[in-house]
Design a protein with these regions (language model features):
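A short glycine-rich beta-alpha junction/loop motif
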Residues: 125-131, 141, 161-187
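Short, ligand-facing micro-motifs at secondary-structure edges
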Residues: 75-88, 102-128, 141-145, 153-162
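Amphipathic alpha-helical coiled-coil/heptad-repeat segments
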Residues: 1-19, 149, 179-236
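Non-catalytic DNA-recognition/assembly elements of restriction-modification systems
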Residues: 25-52, 174, 179, 183, ...
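Short coil/turn segments at secondary-structure boundaries
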Residues: 21-25, 55-63, 159
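Sequence-specific dsDNA recognition surfaces
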Residues: 43-58, 67, 72-101, 124
């Protein structure tokens, strides 16, 4: 996973052309960037919005309520609809998600979960909770990769403390990112990362399967010895 984040970070801060002329970004943890790229605050390339506040008494069932996306609905960088909550309260149109929105966890008891995000695909009449925010922009997949790079991780770490583990709208909007405005270059970076990340995910899944097999074998071996089905060899 750390290697995957490093690959993403390299692509969204250095580009794909190793011979590109570079300049200093002015951001210590980013270093040099391609000369024609810019350093912008993320609020300059899109808009963010905080989620719906609701009470426990607003909870209802699927047939009568509006689905509220929460932190648990983001799994492995994708939207998961296996743990759903519905509310009966009125939801304004500006609090309903649209295709291409980036859903971000902005507050959580676990600081490791703050900042996790996923792109909204085809969801209709769906809102998002108060501990979440959405970011709406013209290049969602490109920005999604920026938000899954070390740039975002370092930024979160710059203001997190032992008592502050939330991403406010102001903090998010003022985050400095490296940005290339050329849509063709954005598209090439996205295509490269789609392919590379798919390859890495396959390797990770394969390693996890191997570890699961070894864990099952270990449990089986322990069971056989503690139940006497196998005996521990004794050296005479």
């Amino acid at each position: 996973e750390d290697y995957k984040k490093s690959v993403i970070t390299e692509a969204v801060t250095k580009g794909l052309n190793p011979d590109a002329e570079m300049k200093d970004s002015g951001i210590e943890w980013i270093g040099e960037i391609p000369k024609h790229w810019k350093v912008l605050r993320i609020k300059n390339v899109g808009e963010y919005r905080n989620g719906l506040t609701y009470k426990p008494t607003d909870l209802t069932d699927e047939n009568t309520g509006t689905l509220v996306l929460r932190s648990s609905n983001i799994q492995d960088g994708k939207i998961s609809l296996n743990d759903n909550v519905y509310v009966s309260t009125f939801v304004r149109s500006d609090l309903k998600v649209k295709k291409g929105d980036i859903l971000i966890c902005s507050r959580n008891g676990s600081r490791e979960l703050v900042g996790k995000n996923a792109i909204i695909e085809d969801l209709k009449d769906v809102t998002f909770g108060a501990f979440m925010m959405i970011f709406r922009c013209n290049s969602p997949k490109y920005l999604y990769y920026i938000l899954n790079s070390k740039v975002f991780s370092y930024y979160l770490g710059s203001f997190f403390t032992s008592t502050i583990t939330q991403l406010t709208g102001s903090n998010f909007g003022n985050m400095k990112i490296v940005y290339v405005s050329d849509k063709l270059e954005q598209s090439k970076i996205v295509s490269y990362l789609d392919s590379k990340c798919s390859e890495i995910d396959s390797l990770i899944a394969d390693k996890k399967r191997q570890l699961d097999i070894l864990a099952d074998y270990k449990k089986s071996l322990i069971y056989e010895y503690v139940t006497g089905k196998k005996e521990v060899p004794v050296n005479e």
